[in-house]
Each structure stands twice: as structure tokens, then as C-alpha cells.
């Protein structure tokens, strides 16, 4: 299954400032608890996160830039997953990811310092009368990241086939 989500932000009455904060995201998901990487009690679970940069799970993904991030795990005895794709023309692409082993995954285009204190504070000021568009694809799949051909599906998203009608 594929969902394409286009988010249009327009500052109609005044400037809108998006803080450099890990809680700001343009698209988020929570997976079934059986897909969590760690249970709330700290017990290893069936889940696994992977991103386009080769990062695995929270320690290697949280706050890092990537074109996409996949969360896979077992639901009702079957390996399934969901991938968030960040469109290559989005502001601050590739985004940083607020990714947690307890099942949370969020793309965050506005923040740097909250993820890495050595980087400058950023944020974004959307001026009155201006707009900002974010495009994302949600890919819901069977199998692991590799089995679901996530890399190929991302390439299809950013380089769609050209169709000529004669």
C-alpha cells in the first residue's frame, strides 16, 4: 500500500516560526507495540528500524539525516513494515529523524541543535503570505526492508516513470 501525503502550510495572518525542537515533525507514525524494538520494560522485541544512510535502530537513526526511514516488525505472526519517504524537493531534505525504539518515527525538517548541540540552532520562519509544501510517501509493506525493496520504491517515488499519451 502507498499513501502520498502533501502538506501545504500558508501563513495567512502573521509570520509562523517553527522552533528547533525534536517534537516538531511534518509526518509521524506509531507502529503496533509488537513491532517496537524494545518493550517498555526494556525487553528486546521484533522491531527493527533502518534508514537510507544504513543506520539501524534509534542509536544510529535518531537525529540523523536520511531520505527515508523504515520500521519493520512482527504483527500477528507476519513480518510487516512501514516506510516514510521524504521527497527530494522538501525543505531541508534529507530531513533529520526523531526515531525511537518504542515505535515512534517522525521526520523533522526544522531542527538541528536539539539533535546535536554542536550544530547551530535553526528553526524556520514562514513569512506572512508565504507557503511551504511538504511531500511524503508512506509505504506499507510485507517483509523486511530488503524484502520489500524499499530502496527501489524510494527511487520510483523521486523518479516516477514518464508517461506519453499518443
Q: Where on the chain are the PLM-derived regions?
A:
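Beta-strand elements of well-folded, non-transmembrane domains
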Residues: 9-13, 31-35, 138-142
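Intrinsically disordered, low-complexity acidic/polar segments
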Residues: 16, 38, 143-147
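Active-site/ligand-binding surface loops and adjacent short beta/alpha elements
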Residues: 17, 21-92
Amino acid at each position: 500500500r502507498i499513501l502520498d501525503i502533501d502538506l501545504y502550510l500558508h501563513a495567512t495572518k502573521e509570520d509562523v516560526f517553527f522552533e528547533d525542537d525534536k517534537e516538531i515533525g511534518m509526518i509521524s507514525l506509531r507502529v503496533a507495540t509488537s513491532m517496537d524494538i524494545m518493550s517498555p520494560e526494556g525487553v528486546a522485541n521484533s522491531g527493527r528500524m533502518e534508514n537510507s544512510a544504513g543506520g539501524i535502530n534509534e542509536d544510529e537513526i535518531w537525529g540523523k539525516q536520511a531520505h527515508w526511514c523504515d520500521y519493520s516488525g512482527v504483527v500477528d505472526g507476519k513480518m510487516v513494515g512501514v516506510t516514510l519517504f521524504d521527497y527530494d524537493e522538501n525543505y531541508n531534505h534529507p530531513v533529520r529523524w526523531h526515531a525511537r525504539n518504542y515505535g515512534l518515527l517522525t521526520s523533522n525538517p526544522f531542527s538541528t541543535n536539539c539533535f546535536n548541540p554542536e550544530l547551530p540552532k535553526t528553526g524556520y520562519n514562514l513569512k506572512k503570505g508565504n507557503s511551504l509544501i511538504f511531500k511524503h510517501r508512506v509505504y506499507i509493506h510485507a517483509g523486511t526492508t530488503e524484502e520489500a525493496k524499499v530502496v527501489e520504491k524510494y527511487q520510483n517515488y523521486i523518479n516516477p516513470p514518464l508517461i506519453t499519451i499518443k
